[in-house]
Amino acid sequence: MIKLKVKKGDEVVVITGKHKGKKGKILKVFPEDSKVIVSGVNVVKKHTKPNQMSEGGIITKELPIHISNIAHIDPKTGNPTKVAFKFLEDGSKVRVAKKSGEIIGKEGK
């Protein structure tokens, strides 16, 4: 298992596969599988039968994609970037965009 550099709420772009170029926010992270669910990406329609708990019908939902197929969006330029970890003067560890040096995520706000 690899160290994940993604968190819920991060802005990412798909860099490979059928959904290449689509942007979205991370809705859920599955660290044990190294997969994430991104809003508006890998959307499928599922046909469900009616039962006592719910009605039947067609529902749309996002399926997980592997983290190797996504890249963070640089907050400064808006382009895909790699992520590094950096320690600030106060000793806190933050995620930084390698291209611009901007802090990524809630730590930067």
Curated annotation (Swiss-Prot):
GO terms for cellular component: ribonucleoprotein complex; ribosome. GO terms for molecular function: rRNA binding; structural constituent of ribosome. The keyword Ribosomal protein applies. Keywords: Ribonucleoprotein, Ribosomal protein, RNA-binding, rRNA-binding. It comes from the Bacteria. GO terms for biological process: translation. CDD domains: KOW_RPL26. InterPro entries: KOW, Rib_uL2_dom2, Ribosomal_uL24, Ribosomal_uL24_CS, Ribosomal_uL24_KOW, Translation_prot_SH3-like_sf. One of two assembly initiator proteins, it binds directly to the 5'-end of the 23S rRNA, where it nucleates assembly of the 50S subunit. One of the proteins that surrounds the polypeptide exit tunnel on the outside of the subunit. Part of the 50S ribosomal subunit. Belongs to the universal ribosomal protein uL24 family. This is Large ribosomal subunit protein uL24.
